[in-house]
UniProtKB/Swiss-Prot annotation:
Regulation: Activity is not influenced by the addition of S-adenosylmethionine, the allosteric activator of TS from Arabidopsis thaliana.
Reactions this protein catalyses: O-phospho-L-homoserine + H2O = L-threonine + phosphate
Taxonomy, superkingdom: Bacteria
InterPro entries: Ser/Thr_Dehydratase, Ser/Thr_deHydtase_PyrdxlP-BS, Thr_synthase-like, Thr_Synthase_bac/arc, TrpB-like_PALP, TrpB-like_PALP_sf
GO MF annotations, alphabetized: pyridoxal phosphate binding; threonine synthase activity
Cofactor(s), names only, from the UniProt record: pyridoxal 5'-phosphate
Gene: thrC
Protein name per its UniProtKB record: Threonine synthase
Pfam families: PALP
Amino acid sequence: MTVPPTATHQPWPGVIAAYRDRLPVGDDWTPVTLLEGGTPLIAATNLSKQTGCTIHLKVEGLNPTGSFKDRGMTMAVTDALAHGQRAVLCASTGNTSASAAAYAARAGITCAVLIPQGKIAMGKLAQAVMHGAKIIQIDGNFDDCLELARKMAADFPTISLVNSVNPVRIEGQKTAAFEIVDVLGTAPDVHALPVGNAGNITAYWKGYTEYHQLGLIDKLPRMLGTQAAGAAPLVLGEPVSHPETIATAIRIGSPASWTSAVEAQQQSKGRFLAASDEEILAAYHLVARVEGVFVEPASAASIAGLLKAIDDGWVARGSTVVCTVTGNGLKDPDTALKDMPSVSPVPVDPVAVVEKLGLA
């Protein structure tokens, strides 16, 4: 007896296989993949009711290493392997190192990570350690680490720099815009996302414009990039020497993709704005409690920025908005645990438990 299937399952092939004809990949290249991409676009029904907009969340924390970085890393490591390079190198506050280490392990090559002094989310660093990365802490901030990494890659051609200054990273990350259009059938009115090193806003804009040039969409979104107030060089129009924010993934004072990010903002008639740590944390708790989506603090910057832009009228009620939430909340559990309530035991008694829950 043959049992009919209860669901149709179409295995996702990874971003290179899914969009190979739109990516700079050689015919004889073998993708280094963990089946990244294909992440859900979730209708944020409660946020939509609260704001009067139609909001969708692009949940990039469901990529293999828990962040959007995997889209670009499959391209970067595939490219490095195809060109015979023996190691990949990155400067990282966490997510890039986790992704680079995983894909390097998959490819069988060395991964080296330069991390700054100061706050690093341990959940992210643990991933890089588990994948066998060689980690070196630098006496400086992220921007110092990236400058050093650039010099090393320039001086040693067997090493590939896989930060978002590597253009093939942007190529991989643009596929998220393709996926959004493929699901919605059009571009959103506004696309909101966090901005740190600014590669992602660059990549999304590239993806949307390529689909527009191909005639697959007839409009382009306005790009809304939110930075943490303590690390907001694009908002201020000048580098920040000592960036500081609870959102460690966007604690960057001089974005590597500054020029292309400004182009994306200007060409889309978009906007950069700053959200305080308090506003970011409020959005972090809000999206977890009303939508069931647990994100790391930096991811919540996109929602914090959107709420501010709705309040000041820049985003009109009734607009269709996509918010990219870039990383999983398990990347930075310490932030969530700061609000852990004190726990006191109750008797082994159902009535006592129901009363404790306030359900009596």
